């Protein structure tokens, strides 16, 4: 079962190259994760109030745990909402 390619050339298409994202909290002048820094924490909360996963934000696993703990602490203290309607 051989399939002939239309157009002849036989060249394969290169796959889409996706650049690997780096963690925004690693590096020399990276911001510190603090539960009082509401403006920073809001960047990692969805419009429904959920914590955005690290595969989307490119945060490392260690920093994602710190980030989620800071968001939960800020929610408990009333600095961030639990749910956004």
Swiss-Prot record:
Arranged from A to Z, the UniProt key words for this protein are: Ribonucleoprotein, Ribosomal protein, RNA-binding, rRNA-binding
Q: Which top-level group of life is the source organism from?
A: Bacteria
Does the UniProt entry include the keyword rRNA-binding? yes
Q: Region Disordered: what ranges?
A: 1-22
Question: Could you name the Gene Ontology cellular component terms for this entry?
Answer: cytosolic small ribosomal subunit
* Segments of skewed composition (Gly residues): 1-12
User: GO biological process annotations for this chain's record?
Assistant: translation
Q: Which GO terms describe its molecular function?
A: small ribosomal subunit rRNA binding; structural constituent of ribosome
Has UniProt tagged this entry with the keyword RNA-binding? yes
InterPro entries per UniProt: Ribosomal_bS18 (IPR001648), Ribosomal_bS18_CS (IPR018275), Ribosomal_bS18_sf (IPR036870)
**Subunit (UniProt):** Part of the 30S ribosomal subunit. Forms a tight heterodimer with protein bS6.
Outline what the protein does.
Binds as a heterodimer with protein bS6 to the central domain of the 16S rRNA, where it helps stabilize the platform of the 30S subunit.
Q: Give the similarity note.
A: Belongs to the bacterial ribosomal protein bS18 family.
Q: Mind telling me which HAMAP family this protein's record contains? A: Ribosomal_bS18 (MF_00270)
Protein name (Swiss-Prot/TrEMBL): Small ribosomal subunit protein bS18
What is the scientific name of the source organism? Azorhizobium caulinodans (strain ATCC 43989 / DSM 5975 / JCM 20966 / LMG 6465 / NBRC 14845 / NCIMB 13405 / ORS 571)
